[in-house]
């Protein structure tokens, strides 16, 4: 993506009316959840600071009575943190209910919550940098700074639609402009960017602008998940839009994972991003299945259509099994909500049972395959892994044999659906999602009714063993990069000049204004290029040489008019219009860099969907090693703690003799 700069003439500091956040977080359900998440984040931050101060006091004092009091207070703080973490996990683990103005009931999806951030004051560092490096009055850029701050404030509460995505990408593109104009390998803005982890609520802060860009990119992916989960997937078009949104979300997480290392928060670690990418691809695959199987138009007698649906369902089940294995392994197991892992497991069992159900429908209600169709139909099945018999035809043609095999597949479908209901009942958060239970129960009732129809009292034949279903899909979803160009807008600080010259990476000296009079051979200089116009050559002994102009200077003002954005023809026309009085020019001369950047200072910059993120640790600006900036104290609140519970609340520490500070933390905390 090429950054678009606007020439002079556009009003500085004008805020586009479409780039505005939600007026109130409480207008919609998602806004209410986001508002509550923000409150919990602030409470967690406060409790962490209290715990840090108490631990420092414990280490500093040698009075046993004071230590006992501090240890007791720490136990209360740890209990409060545990409760806050569990509440945040419930909010983060909430799933989409699956009904959006439609009579049909669909399986719920998993949307991600947005990362929260604190307000940021851009004014002081930007004004100082504009004054020191660019040689201009920083106060004259207050309108631009206010526009940037308003844009950042608005992107904290984006609407859950395309306008919200446009708002986030607009701010992301402005960060790219800021990176290109104001940052160098040896200089950062000196601001601390403070963001809360989306999964754990742990606060993290860094001075690197890359952390801000990475967090915004994460929110772009998270907003795509919310848009996808809100679609009405009971119709083909809604399923297509949902699949598109989940693919865009997977692309955002993939881009972040490939180009952002040493993440300060768990949700942006490589392991978490990989798990989120797999989850989004599995949900996109589920949308493919839903787009193929509108219940009203399905003909049970269409054997080939039923077998294709069976393979599509088996493909969805395989995707969710992969996601479940990833979520069950550390460190992802310690980050993601328990309800996510449970829902993924339920879906894996549900879609595997659905595959067997569709095969049973094909065998029992469909017509036998012809000799030419038989090889294609048999590719649906996999032989049982424990079978030692030689492989024979797996798709019988006789009516009774088809009934027996269909009955075996129905049995596996019923067992799988009952297992899905059992797993659903084990998770308290999922139990609150009645629609999920309704979907599984409805499918189970259909399977039981069909099984009762096939069952006979005089059927004493040995039950056949139903083979596994070969996963296959006609459309494999792929991660797609988010449309970072849809929010592309002009550079807010365009008045400073074109980025090719007027950036913190270059040093220059302002010359002039100098007065030029026309001689016999003109002004004695040759111009080239646009925005800004370059003095390509100066004739020795000419008027330009006498005025001190040099080859390589850039013209920034003609007769008092700023011309940094003028084209070559405009500058030439203005100079030709000068009469005997001549013209007044102001130029800048580029200076050699005082120090060439070393190899370690050369870091890529993410300017678009195919670029790279600048390293988040700016040279010479280290993030303070504060205890609340580390994600580790909160990552294992409930997992290990609940394993060691014997009932009731955590027991307060009552040390008889001074214990090391690490023993004051909740069991299972690092």
From Swiss-Prot:
GO terms for biological process: negative regulation of stress fiber assembly; signal transduction. SUPFAM superfamilies: HR1 repeat (SSF46585), PDZ domain-like (SSF50156). SMART domains: BRO1 (SM01041), Hr1 (SM00742), PDZ (SM00228). The keyword Coiled coil applies. Residues 23-97 form the REM-1 domain. Residues 1-20, 616-670 are annotated as: Disordered. InterPro entries: BRO1_dom, BRO1_sf, HR1_rho-bd, HR1_rpt_sf, PDZ, PDZ_sf, Rhophilin-1_BRO1, RHPN1_2. The keyword Iron does not apply. GO terms for cellular component: cytosol. It comes from the Eukaryota. Residues 652-661 have a biased composition (Pro residues). Signal peptide: none annotated. Residues 108-457 form the BRO1 domain. Keywords: Coiled coil, Phosphoprotein. Belongs to the RHPN family. Has no enzymatic activity. May serve as a target for Rho, and interact with some cytoskeletal component upon Rho binding or relay a Rho signal to other molecules. PANTHER family: RHOPHILIN (PTHR23031), RHOPHILIN-1 (PTHR23031:SF6). Binds specifically to GTP-Rho. Interacts with ROPN1. This is Rhophilin-1. It comes from Homo sapiens.
């Amino acid at each position: 993506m090429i950054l678009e700069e606007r020439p002079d003439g556009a009003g500085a500091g004008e805020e586009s009316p479409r780039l505005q956040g939600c007026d109130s977080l409480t207008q919609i359900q998602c806004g209410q959840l986001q508002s509550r998440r923000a409150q919990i984040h602030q409470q967690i931050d406060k409790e962490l600071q209290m715990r840090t101060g108490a631990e420092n006091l414990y280490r500093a004092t040698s009075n046993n009575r004071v230590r006992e009091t501090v240890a007791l207070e720490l136990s209360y703080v740890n209990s409060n943190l545990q409760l806050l973490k569990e509440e945040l996990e419930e909010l983060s683990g909430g799933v989409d209910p699956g009904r959006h103005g439609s009579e049909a009931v669909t399986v719920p999806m998993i949307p991600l919550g947005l990362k929260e951030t604190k307000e940021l004051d851009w004014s002081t560092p930007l004004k100082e940098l504009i004054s020191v490096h660019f040689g201009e009055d920083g106060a004259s850029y207050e309108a631009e700074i206010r526009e940037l701050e308003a844009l950042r404030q608005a992107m904290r509460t984006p609407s859950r639609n395309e306008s919200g995505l446009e708002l986030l990408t607009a701010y992301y593109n402005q960060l790219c402009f800021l990176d290109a104009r104001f940052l160098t390998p040896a200089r950062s803005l000196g601001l601390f960017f403070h963001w809360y982890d989306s999964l754990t609520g742990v606060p993290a802060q860094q001075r690197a602008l890359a952390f801000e860009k990475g967090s915004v990119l994460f929110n772009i992916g998270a907003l795509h998940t919310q848009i996808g989960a809100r679609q009405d997937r009971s119709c083909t078009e809604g399923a297509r839009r949902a699949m598109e949104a989940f693919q865009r979300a997977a692309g955002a997480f993939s881009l972040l994972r490939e180009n952002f290392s040493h993440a300060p928060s768990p949700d942006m670690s490589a392991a978490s991003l990989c798990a989120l990418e797999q989850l989004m691809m599995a949900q996109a695959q589920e949308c493919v299945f839903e787009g193929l199987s509108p219940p009203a138009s399905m003909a049970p007698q269409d054997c080939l259509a039923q077998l294709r649906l069976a393979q599509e369902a088996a493909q969805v089940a395989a995707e969710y099994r992969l996601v479940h294995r990833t979520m069950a392994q550390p460190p992802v197991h310690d980050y993601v909500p328990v309800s996510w892992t449970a829902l993924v497991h339920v879906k894996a069992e549900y879609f595997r049972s659905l595959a067997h159900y569709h095969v049973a429908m094909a065998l029992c209600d469909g017509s036998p395959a012809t000799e030419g169709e038989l090889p294609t139909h048999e590719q649906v099945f996999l032989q049982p892994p424990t079978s030692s018999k030689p492989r024979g035809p797996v798709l019988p043609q006789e009516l009774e044999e088809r009934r027996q095999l269909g009955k075996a597949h129905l049995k596996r479908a019923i067992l799988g659906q009952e297992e899905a209901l059992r797993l659903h009942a084990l998770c308290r958060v999922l139990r609150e999602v009645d629609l999920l239970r309704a979907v599984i129960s409805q499918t189970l009732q259909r399977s039981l009714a069909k099984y009762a129809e096939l069952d006979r009292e005089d059927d004493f034949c040995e039950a056949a063993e139903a083979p596994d279903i070969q996963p296959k899909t006609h459309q494999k979803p792929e991660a797609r990069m988010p449309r970072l160009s849809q929010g592309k807008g002009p550079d807010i600080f365009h008045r400073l000049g074109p980025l090719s010259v007027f950036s913190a990476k270059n040093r220059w000296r302002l010359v002039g204004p100098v007065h030029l009079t026309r001689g016999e051979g003109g002004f004695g200089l040759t111009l080239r290029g646009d925005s800004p116009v370059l003095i390509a050559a100066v004739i020795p002994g000419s008027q330009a040489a006498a005025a001190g102009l040099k080859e390589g200077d850039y013209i920034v003002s003609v007769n008092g008019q700023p011309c940094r954005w003028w084209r070559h023809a405009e500058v030439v026309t203005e100079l030709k219009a000068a009469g005997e009085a001549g013209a007044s020019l102001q130029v800048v001369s580029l200076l050699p860099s005082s120090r060439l950047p070393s190899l370690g200072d050369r870091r890529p910059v993410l300017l678009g969907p195919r670029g790279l993120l600048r390293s988040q640790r700016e040279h010479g600006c280290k993030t303070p090693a504060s205890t609340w900036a580390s994600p580790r104290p909160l990552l294992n609140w409930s997992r290990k703690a609940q394993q060691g519970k014997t009932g009731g609340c955590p027991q307060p520490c009552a040390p008889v003799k001074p214990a090391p500070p690490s023993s004051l933390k909740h069991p299972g905390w690092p």
